[in-house]
């Protein structure tokens, strides 16, 4: 399933490949003197971002040099035949950018795509890289709905099955300049709305009102104008049929939610470099602006375009249970990282719904991690599991209850035995004091006999 996809019925083609969604934040700021104050300002900004994400229950971790070359190397050196990520050896005496690229790496630039070639273990691999960027601002966008662009819950066929990188590059524009621009725009539109121009173009009144509200938010510091570039980079095998399927999957998935994407003919190399960390600050974002592919919107609207997926992988091991968006996830209720204070679990379902099919893998994961399991089975549903795992299956029909087992002092244990017999004698309610007293006398008499 991880290599291709889950088996499906005849005539059904759903992209049910396993996923491992990750979000990486990179930030670069111009600095002429490279002073300690600039570094301290950036460190404080990173702390604010991490604290904000932690407030939304999104855990983060800092990327060190080893993690950096592993992440960027995985983004650059894509091998469609590789199933596991490759860990690279960090050389502290060499620049990081040279350590991210394989020695056998070659890249061919085409008009409509890029071709990436590698050679590993005596075998050549070729991958095709496709890029698509946002043609215009969407009419409406919600942060909770962004994941439907690449893994739709209600329409699973509108999903992206190939590996991809979704990049959102943004720059907050100067507040004073944007405020002045909004003032000029508002004054011009308001002037036109009071003339005969408004009779020919009725929308000018609405535009004047919107620019008036925007300048108020900019003046009070409640909002900012952001220039952003949204791009998706997809990797697939180097053949035309597969590339066409990937292209249609991406365009249709985003179009479903009102996002119009286009393929940057003759500019795939530019878009591919955009997904790499810190490249936008090296003059690439200026090239994007000159090409006219950068969009503008308020900071609130751009924040709703962030590529976040609310699917948690839960635990590093346990029962494999992918989410609805095919995120690779595991269930282990005893994992300490989940901070569980109650390890009880209830499973409900009709007959034949698969309750036993869920619990059996959980039992296997507990046994594989060194634990033990005790099952009270009514219906022999766990008999084969017990035999396969080398356990001991006890038939309840041959068992007998001895309430006096392991008792050495009847004076200390008589009331406990009395309580056990009370439950057996009256399972639907408590006995009164008279009957409990008679049972206690019977327990002592039986022990002495």
Regions found by a protein language model. Name each.
Residues 18-20, 225-227, 324, 340-342, ...:
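Short, solvent-exposed loop/turn segments at the edges of secondary structure
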Residues 1, 448-449:
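Short, intrinsically disordered, charge-balanced linker/junction segments flanking boundaries
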Residues 26-28, 167-169, 233, 319-322, ...:
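Residues in well-ordered beta-strands of folded domains
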Residues 1, 315-396:
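Glycine-rich phosphate-binding loop of nucleotide-binding enzymes
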Residues 11-13, 154, 217-221, 317-319, ...:
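Generic recognition of flexible, low-complexity loop/linker segments
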Residues 1-302:
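Extended, folded cores of ATP/NTP-driven motor/assembly subunits in large transport
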Residues 14-16, 360-448:
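Switch/coupling segment of Walker-type NTPase motor domains
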């Amino acid at each position: 399933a991880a290599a291709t996809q889950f088996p499906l019925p005849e005539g059904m083609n759903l992209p049910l490949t396993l996923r491992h969604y990750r979000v990486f934040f990179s930030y670069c700021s111009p600095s002429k003197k490279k002073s300690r104050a600039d570094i301290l300002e950036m460190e404080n900004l990173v702390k604010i971002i991490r604290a904000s994400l932690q407030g939304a229950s999104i855990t983060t971790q800092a990327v060190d040099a080893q993690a950096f070359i592993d992440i960027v190397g995985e983004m650059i050196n894509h091998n469609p035949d590789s199933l596991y990520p490759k860990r690279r050896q960090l050389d502290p005496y060499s620049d990081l950018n040279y350590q991210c690229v394989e020695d056998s790496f070659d890249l061919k630039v085409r008009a409509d795509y890029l071709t990436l070639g590698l050679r590993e273990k005596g075998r050549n691999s070729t991958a095709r890289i496709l890029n698509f960027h946002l043609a215009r601002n969407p009419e409406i966008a919600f942060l909770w709905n962004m994941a439907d662009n690449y893994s739709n819950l209600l329409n699973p066929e509108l999903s992206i099955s190939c590996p991809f990188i979704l990049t959102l590059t943004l720059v907050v524009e100067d507040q004073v300049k944007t405020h002045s621009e909004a003032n000029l725009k508002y004054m011009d539109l308001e002037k036109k709305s009071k003339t005969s121009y408004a009779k020919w173009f009725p929308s000018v009144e609405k535009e004047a009102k919107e620019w008036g509200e925007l300048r108020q938010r900019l003046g009070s510091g409640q909002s900012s104008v952001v220039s952003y570039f949204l791009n998706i980079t997809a990797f697939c095998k180097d053949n035309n049929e597969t590339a066409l399927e990937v292209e249609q999957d991406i365009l249709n998935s985003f179009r479903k939610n009102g996002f119009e994407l286009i393929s940057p003919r003759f500019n795939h190399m530019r878009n591919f470099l955009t997904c790499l960390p810190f490249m936008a600050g090296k003059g690439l974002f200026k090239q994007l602006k000159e090409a006219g592919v950068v969009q503008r919107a308020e900071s609130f609207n751009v924040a709703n375009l962030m590529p976040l997926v609310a699917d948690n992988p839960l635990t590093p091991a346990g029962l494999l249970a992918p989410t609805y968006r095919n995120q690779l996830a595991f269930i282990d209720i005893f994992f300490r990282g989940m901070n569980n204070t109650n390890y009880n679990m209830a499973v409900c379902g009709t007959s034949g719904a698969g309750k036993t099919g869920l619990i059996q893998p959980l039992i296997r994961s507990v046994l594989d991690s060194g634990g033990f399991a005790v099952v009270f089975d009514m219906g022999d549903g766990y008999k084969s599991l017990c035999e396969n795992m080398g356990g001991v299956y006890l038939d309840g029909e041959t068992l007998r209850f001895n309430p006096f087992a392991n008792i050495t002092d009847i004076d200390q244990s008589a009331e406990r035995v009395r309580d056990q017999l009370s439950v057996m004698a009256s399972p639907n309610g408590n006995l009164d004091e008279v009957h409990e007293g008679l049972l206690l006398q019977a327990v002592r008499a039986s022990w002495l006999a």
